[in-house]
Regions:
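Short phosphate-coordinating micro-motif centered on Lys-Gly-acidic
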Residues: 2, 85, 93-146
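Short beta-strand-centered segment that lines the nucleotide-binding/catalytic pocket of NTP-utilizing
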Residues: 52-67
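Conserved lysine of the Walker
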Residues: 39
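Phosphate-binding P-loop
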Residues: 19-26
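N-terminal pre-Walker A segment at the start of P-loop NTPase domains
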Residues: 1-18
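The conserved Walker
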Residues: 35
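Switch II (G3) loop of P-loop NTPases
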Residues: 75-82
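Hydrophobic anchor at the beta1->P-loop junction of P-loop NTPases
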Residues: 29-31
Length: 146
């Protein structure tokens, strides 16, 4: 488990870009954090490191966006999904078992259908340390829940 501290969006992006160097085809990144914690900013940092040139936006209404770069990035937003079962989300397997990287915001909402071995990234705000302060915990062991 690795813990990072960020004091602004630029630092969050740099942390994500460094983290992206550890990803490989088939990696699944499960993001958790409150609204406005920086999940999309973290995703944008990963995408940038993987050669994506277009702007990354949260796919709240489409559920998944695809970005092509040196490696394909599938960016999910599971905010609107609740009480999912494997049958509800069997379409996700096409992404989870692809040659791209899956990054899932609000992953706890679909935790029941995530394949084993995903990487958990938790982003926490702490206003006592500043409005833009973030604690970013990356657990690559798969032991921490999203």
């Amino acid at each position: 488990m690795k813990i990072f501290e960020s004091h602004n969006v630029g630092e969050t992006s740099k942390i994500a870009q460094e983290f992206a160097k550890t990803l490989k085809e088939g990696s699944i990144v499960a993001l958790s954090g409150d609204l406005g914690a920086g999940k999309t900013a973290f995703t944008a940092g990963i995408a940038k490191a993987l050669g994506v040139r277009e702007a990354v936006t949260s796919p709240t209404f489409t559920i998944v966006n695809q970005y092509d770069g040196d490696m394909t990035v599938y960016h999910f937003d599971a905010y609107r999904l609740e009480n999912v079962t494997p049958d509800d989300c069997d379409w996700m397997d096409d992404y989870f078992f692809s040659d791209g990287v899956c990054i899932i915001e609000w992953a706890k909402n679909i935790e029941a259908v995530l394949p084993r071995g995903y990487i958990s990234v938790q982003i926490e705000k702490d206003s006592a340390l500043g409005e833009d302060y973030r604690k970013i915990t990356i657990d690559e062991t798969g032991e921490t829940k999203c």
